[in-house]
Amino acid sequence: MISIDLLDNSGTSMPADTSIKLHEVIKFISKSKKMTVLTGAGISCNAGIPDFRSSDGLYNMVKAKHPKAVVRGQDLFDISLFRDEMSLSVFCTFMESLYKSSLNAKPTETHKFIKILKDKNKLLRCYTQNIDCIEQHINLKLGINLQEFDNNKFKQVWNQLDVVQLHGNLHKLSCTNCFSQFNWNEEFQTLLANGLNPECSKCMDKYQQRLYSGKRLTGQTIGLLRPDIVLYGEHHPQMEILTQGLNSDLKSRPDCLIIMGTSLKVAGVKSLVKSLSKIIHNKGGKVIYVNKTKLSASSWKNYIDYEVVSDCDEFVRMLKTEIPDLFLTQEQLDSEKLNQVAVKGSSLNKPIVKPEAKVKIEPGIKQEDAIQYSPEREVTIKQEVNIKQEPIVKREVESVSVKEEPIPTPPTTPHKPKQATKLKRKSPDEISANEVHSRVKRLRPRNDQLSSPASSINGSEEEEEEDEPVAKVLFENARKGITLDQH
């Protein structure tokens, strides 16, 4: 458990080590997406509700009305006070004073922080030990209605709750006999301020019906109305609903738990913190404790990661400074972005105006002459006094005649003329005997046409004699590489 003491560093510069640790806490809160919050009486001290033990506290106010009563502060929240009429009367007066103070209480920075987490969809659930119901002033839904859980699906009704009151609701009255719930009214408030408990109207109606019908009245009692809160040593009337709801939240696997304004001394709250811490650490989350008093390091070192010793509201104000976007609504964020875009656009469109140079009068120059000089020549005036200017050389630019040339067209593929096929002369070795005989056969009809008709009639001996020299000639020509087509 890392301890960060902000009370010792108030008004002074924060040490580097403390600043680094605090930055880790702030960074984790800003990145968390599914948070659970546990609150105690410490977050309501700045709401206008008097504390219990100071000179103007509620205990002294009650003693002023009941000077003979000897009741300790802890006894006002114990179930044993119902055994004594004097203790019960003190209890009624104390609760009426606390109820009146809660009506005039204003939400603190811590209450508003819980509301912001809800609006940003970062809040899974807020569990509170407080019974003052200040959260309802900022439109956070709280209070367990038994009829709603009986008539509808459990998970649907449970997920509609923003704040779960672990120790009851001061703004409701419940019957000690039938457990029916009632709202406060002027009659009930007057009776309780005087130390008297109002009677339950439902129990009274049931009693009268049995009385008028002539039925037995044995065991029929009329209950008394008292604030719907859980006292020490008393069984919680909504324990089944709370247990089922807490198990549902554990299955949702939150990634952060912030504990604010409680000393963690109640057994049930200790068990809740340890169960949530185990689930959160398995997911890689962190548990952050914020209160004015320190915890026992040996008891909580395995469950709490960061301990911030500070006033709860001061811690929230510091978060506002470090992560301001978390505390802005979506409309405010959108308008801020539009303003930034507008400022950037105006700065881009704004013309750049150069400042006019002032003419400085050098010694030896009259004021009238100085006025004739333009601001652009301010620098040249100084140069003329001390530095000789080089003569300006005019360079003539030769005129260059440019010939107009036709715009080149994209080249086309040139036409390649077909080359005549060259006859390849065969060597004598390449000519076979079959080619020689085939050529001889083709020449025979040509020789027949050239010969006279008489010779063809006279006989074939002369033809054979004539064919023989022709064959020889062809064979000789073939050896030399000469074909008949070339003749």
Swiss-Prot record:
Broadest EC class assigned to this enzyme: transferase
One of the protein's GO biological processes: regulation of phenotypic switching
Active-site residues annotated for this sequence: H167
Disulfide bonds: none
Biased composition (Basic and acidic residues): 397-406
Subcellular location, record wording: Cytoplasm; Nucleus
Cofactor note: Binds 1 zinc ion per subunit.
Polar residues composition-biased segments: 448-459
Name under which the protein is recorded: NAD-dependent histone deacetylase HST3
